[in-house]
């Protein structure tokens, strides 16, 4: 984190030498009303704790249960880690600002927060596509699943997802630090996100917006198409199964993933790809809350309540902790 901040400061000095620029941003948060701050603090602290504990339990349960050491559940563990990281990137700073009655964040910290925000959103997106492909192989080609989806191959897909997300985040960051922000430093948001930062700049942002659209659309379309065609094949395969129990198991496994995917894509596309002029800024905030806070919080509930194997693993983990007391 410190290395990235130092790099940003050096790069900024090189690109903006002899030009007057701001040194901090003001995050307006979700509400300007003083009477709402305590409610927001309690609400988001509760959601943060639930998200960290819930996703943490999924990671621990999968790690300790040898029967869940398959790519399907390892992808879920990686998704849970990305969700914990995503909400930890934005909510703690917001809670600190509420408690200290301070809305400021330094330029370097803001750009760093934006960088990791992009990393975790893109990683979530790519992992959802990877999980859909894994479900497709498991249900449509069950005899070849253990041969094709080996642990090493699953790890490789995860590493590729993290690598691509960092490359994309670095591209946006390097383009952003070349922009000037002049005297405008007020962000109508609760964290430093790319879209509102571009609106705030007094430089020409055409290249930034073009890259955001092209790269963002590519990152969205490929996993979405993979998810769509995977589930078309899965539904056709499941409908051909004569066993009612087999159909229910397949739909319960895939239904959890599909629910998370629809919630994630719906809010992400709404925030980043629809023109801001067509809806108020509050809509962007609500969308950002949904995919950075609500979706990570819902992840453990949706997967644990609809998946028999996860419920069993969590039950064993809880019983083990109780018996050790």
UniProtKB/Swiss-Prot annotation:
InterPro entries, alphabetized: GPCR_Rhodpsn (IPR000276), GPCR_Rhodpsn_7TM (IPR017452), Olfact_rcpt (IPR000725)
SUPFAM superfamilies: Family A G protein-coupled receptor-like
Transmembrane segments: 39-62, 71-92, 114-133, 153-171, 209-232, 250-272, 286-305
Residue ranges, Extracellular side: 1-38, 93-113, 172-208, 273-285
Topology versus the membrane: Multi-pass membrane protein
Topological domains, Cytoplasmic: 63-70, 134-152, 233-249, 306-325
Subcellular location: Cell membrane
Disulfide bonds: 110-202
Alphabetical UniProt keywords: Cell membrane, Disulfide bond, G-protein coupled receptor, Glycoprotein, Membrane, Olfaction, Receptor, Sensory transduction, Transducer, Transmembrane, Transmembrane helix
Keyword presence, Glycoprotein: yes
GO molecular function terms attached to this record: G protein-coupled receptor activity; olfactory receptor activity
GO biological-process terms attached to the record: signal transduction
Glycan-carrying positions: 18
The keyword Ribosomal protein appears for this protein: no
Task performed by this protein: Odorant receptor.
PANTHER family: OLFACTORY RECEPTOR (PTHR48001)
Family, similarity comment: Belongs to the G-protein coupled receptor 1 family.
Protein known as: Olfactory receptor 1S2
Organism, scientific name: Homo sapiens (Human)
């Amino acid at each position: 984190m410190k290395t990235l901040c130092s790099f940003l400061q050096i790069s900024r000095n090189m690109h903006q030498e002899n030009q007057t620029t701001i040194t901090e941003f003001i995050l307006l948060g979700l509400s300007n009303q003083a009477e709402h701050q305590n409610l927001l603090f309690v609400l988001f602290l509760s959601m943060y704790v639930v998200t960290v504990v819930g996703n943490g339990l999924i990671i621990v349960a999968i790690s300790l249960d040898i029967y869940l050491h398959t790519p399907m559940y390892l992808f879920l563990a990686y998704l849970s880690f990305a969700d914990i990281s995503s909400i930890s990137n934005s909510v703690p700073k917001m809670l600190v600002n509420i408690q200290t009655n301070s809305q400021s964040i330094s330029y370097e910290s803001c750009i760093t927060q934006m960088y990791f925000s992009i990393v975790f959103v893109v990683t979530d997106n790519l992992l959802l596509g990877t999980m859909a492909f894994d479900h497709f192989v498991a249900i449509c080609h069950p005899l070849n699943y253990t041969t094709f989806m080996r642990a090493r191959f699953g790890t490789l897909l995860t590493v590729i997802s993290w690598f691509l997300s960092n490359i994309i985040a670095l591209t946006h960051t390097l383009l952003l630090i070349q922009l000037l922000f002049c005297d405008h430093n007020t962000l109508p948001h609760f964290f430093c996100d790319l879209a509102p930062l571009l609106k705030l700049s007094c430089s020409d942002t055409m290249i930034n917006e073009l890259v955001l659209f092209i790269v963002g659309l590519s990152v969205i379309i490929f996993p979405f198409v993979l998810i769509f065609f995977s589930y078309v094949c899965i539904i056709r395969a499941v409908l051909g199964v004569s066993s009612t129990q087999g159909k229910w198991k397949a739909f319960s496994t895939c239904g959890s993933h599909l629910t998370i995917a629809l919630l994630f894509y719906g809010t992400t596309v709404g925030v980043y790809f629809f023109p801001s002029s067509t809806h108020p800024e509050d809509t962007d905030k609500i969308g950002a809350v949904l995919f950075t806070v609500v979706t990570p919080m819902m992840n453990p509930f949706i997967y644990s309540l609809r998946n028999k194997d996860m419920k069993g693993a969590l039950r064993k983990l809880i019983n083990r902790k109780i018996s050790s007391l």
